[in-house]
């Protein structure tokens, strides 16, 4: 088997990321350097300007929030930057560091280089967000041969073991995004009927709202907490939220005082009601677009870590009147599905034939002038149209002596183009005829997100423009410069990561503690630093073990 035949799938998540491979007739998760499947999507820079990715960076959100970045997937497609130490990074660059770490883990596990991968993205990601995802892959030295929608990837993993004709709804609530997809299984075909979503609704929003309520109950203004204190509070609230206990008990520190509060289920439901109601909107839209009622859904598939929150599950059960399908881990199924799609793409001999039909999750069209009103959006391909697809609409020039037209291509669902996303703009020259001219504009869209626009004029000439999701927003030189800069960054040595992660955990505990407890942890840190400086690994292991027992810390 040569390198090109490796079927690799990646779930590049807001909170955690995973990588999987199709191997020995099944999709398998690849462990990271800590033997874990979930790699936190967090980047930090230490005092020696080493980049820390994943678990070693988690604790530094509390101890060094000014040098740590998280939730950057939410900024894909924007101009947001993060400053870590003396360096500045954008969302694709930070994402590329996560992808690079996953790539190294896979190459270590498989003992072979990898290049071509299938990467999952939220179904409702815009064209620009998809471009940034491809750019992140390129900066990491990977080739994203396919971007697969996250609910569709989950359906691939679920559908591979579903030998029956069923209609399913995939409810995908991750750390930062929410997607709903309605599918139908008719072996061996998986047909996507409709998708809807909210790119700014996820588990982090529930955490943020809970933090605000904790501060309100304590009569503490958010502005009185420094970055480290606020990060420590977020960590406490997130841990309590993920415990799914009832009542939810939160214990945190403020100005050398321990604060505690409890939230009962009815209180959480009242608090989170605005977010829970937002979950209904994409569900109702997807069902409406698929022309189905909740009672016509045969199975409910929950995906994403936040979908495991009891109140979220209760909302889903109320809407559909049935319990969710539970025979998989919702945090890992997307990566497995991406690997299955990669295997299907390579036509691996040891995989059953699976035919996937997907949809365009958003409407694509052009800007027109109607009755003297400019800036009107005219859809050519409506949202949730099965792809590949080709559609044509006929338009007319605005003036008899018009010598050119500007084709502004937009995506979105708003009547006004100013509220949609501009995808591309180009001019088409016309021959003056002294009369109004009829113009046909054809959109052809394929499963890889490639859009071809054909403008057919009255004289029979055609002007074509191909719009794809390659990172065209940067020049080849700019991409190469960014790749070179990222490659020059010093990634913390793999063989020392366990000790670095343990040190970060000690620093996090010190940042949270107060008084005598803080002093004791400080002494432990001093002992551990001295052991590290001695380069005596036996001594390092012994100090780490004693510190772990004394402070009840899990050794990574």
Swiss-Prot record:
Induction: By heat shock. Activated up to a temperature of 40 degrees Celsius, after which levels decrease. InterPro entries: ATPase_NBD, Heat_shock_70_CS, HscC_NBD, HSP70_peptide-bd_sf, Hsp_70_fam. The keyword ATP-binding applies. Pfam families: HSP70. GO terms for biological process: chaperone cofactor-dependent protein refolding; protein refolding; response to stress. GO terms for molecular function: ATP binding; ATP hydrolysis activity; ATP-dependent protein folding chaperone; heat shock protein binding; protein folding chaperone. Keywords: ATP-binding, Chaperone, Nucleotide-binding, Stress response. Probable chaperone. Has ATPase activity. Not stimulated by DnaJ. Belongs to the heat shock protein 70 family. This is Chaperone protein HscC. The gene is hscC.
């Amino acid at each position: 088997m040569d390198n090109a035949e490796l079927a690799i799938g990646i779930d590049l998540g807001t909170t955690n990321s995973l990588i999987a491979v199709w191997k020995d007739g099944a999709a398998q998760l690849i462990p990271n350097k800590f033997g874990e499947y979930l790699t936190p999507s967090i980047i930090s820079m230490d005092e020696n300007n080493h980049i820390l990715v994943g678990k070693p960076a988690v604790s530094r959100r509390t101890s060094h929030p000014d040098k740590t970045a998280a939730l950057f997937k939410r900024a894909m497609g924007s101009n947001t930057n993060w400053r870590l130490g003396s360096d500045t990074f954008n969302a694709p660059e930070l994402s590329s560091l996560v992808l690079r770490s996953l790539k190294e883990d896979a190459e270590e596990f498989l003992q072979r280089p990898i290049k071509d991968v299938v990467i999952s993205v939220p179904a409702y990601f815009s064209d620009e967000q998809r471009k940034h995802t491809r750019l992140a892959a390129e900066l990491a030295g990977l080739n994203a041969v396919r971007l697969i929608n996250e609910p569709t990837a989950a359906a691939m993993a679920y559908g591979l073991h579903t030998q029956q004709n069923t209609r399913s709804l995939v409810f995908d609530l991750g750390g930062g995004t929410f997607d709903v997809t309605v599918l139908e299984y008719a072996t061996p075909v998986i047909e996507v009927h409709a998708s809807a979503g909210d790119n700014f609704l996820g588990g982090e929003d529930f955490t943020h709202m809970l933090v605000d309520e904790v501060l309100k109950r304590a009569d503490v203004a958010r502005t009185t907490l420094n970055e480290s204190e606020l990060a420590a509070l977020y960590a406490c609230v997130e841990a309590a939220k993920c415990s799914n206990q009832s009542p939810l008990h939160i214990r945190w520190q403020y100005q050398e005082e321990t604060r505690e509060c409890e939230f009962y289920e009815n209180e959480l439901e009242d608090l989170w009601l605005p977010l829970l109601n937002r979950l209904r909107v994409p569900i109702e839209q997807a069902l409406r677009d698929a022309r189905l009622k909740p009672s016509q859904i045969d199975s409910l598939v929950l995906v994403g870590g936040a979908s495991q929150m009891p109140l979220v599950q209760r909302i889903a059960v109320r809407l559909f009147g049935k319990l969710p399908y539970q025979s998989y881990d919702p945090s890992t199924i997307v990566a497995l599905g991406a690997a299955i799609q990669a295997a299907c793409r390579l036509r691996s001999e040891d995989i059953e034939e699976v035919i996937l039909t997907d949809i365009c999750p958003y409407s694509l069209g052009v800007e027109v002038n109607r009755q003297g009103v400019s800036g009107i959006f005219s859809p050519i391909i409506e949202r949730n149209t099965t792809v590949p697809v080709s559609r044509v609409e006929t338009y007319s020039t605005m003036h008899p002596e018009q010598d050119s037209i500007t084709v502004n291509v937009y995506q979105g669902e708003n009547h006004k183009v100013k509220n949609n996303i501009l995808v591309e703009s180009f001019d088409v020259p016309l021959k003056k005829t002294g009369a109004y001219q009829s113009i046909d504009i054809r959109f052809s869209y394929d499963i890889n997100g490639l859009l071809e626009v054909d403008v057919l004029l009255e004289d029979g000439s055609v002007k074509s423009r191909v719009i794809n999701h390659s990172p065209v927003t940067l020049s080849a030189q700019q991409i190469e410069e960014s790749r070179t800069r990222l490659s020059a960054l010093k990634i913390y040595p793999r063989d020392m990561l366990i000790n670095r992660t343990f040190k970060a955990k000690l620093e996090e505990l010190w940042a949270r503690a107060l008084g005598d407890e803080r002093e004791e942890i400080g002494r432990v840190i001093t002992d551990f630093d001295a052991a590290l400086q001695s380069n005596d690994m036996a001594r390092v292991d012994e100090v780490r073990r004693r510190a772990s027992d004394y402070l009840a810390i899990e050794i990574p």
